[in-house]
Amino acid sequence: MQDVITGDAAVIDALSAFCAGEGAVYHKADQYGNASHWFRLTGTDKVVPAAKVLKKAAARLIMISSYDRSGGLTGFEPELCYHFEVPGVIYSFTVALDAKNPAVPSITPLFANADWHERELRELLNIKVDGHPNPNRLFLDETLDAGKLRSAVPLSVAMNGANSTDLWETILGAKEKQA
């Protein structure tokens, strides 16, 4: 591993200002020298300001992902992870959401490609994305409960491409029960 981790010092300092606590900022480089910087934001109110810092640095949004902090043990405790690339360096920030009312502000006005990511969060996990310019569903019928896939389909089924028939049978079965 290299001794000096590359990255834009101004971006690192600006994102670090939205973090608090030990381990909230983490820097690493892999065996090939690819640098990445991780930031745990103190709250959802820091998502748009952090995205603005990255927009100003000409970052490219790579992906927004969600995971369950509880590991499925105590109910759904969502956390979002935003991944950006500023030529050659990855900047990621995470933010924990309220388990009872998961909501996050939209960054689609800053990064147009956040549109689908944020709509998936709403559709599949029932995470409210405040201020999204087009909150329509992408894939699932509007009659299905929002976030249905969070509880209806085991992760092993959802992740196994060979079982996509099982996935859709579960979704359609839930819809038939509602009718």
Regions found by a protein language model. Give the residues of each.
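Terminal low-complexity/charged segments
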Residues: 1-179
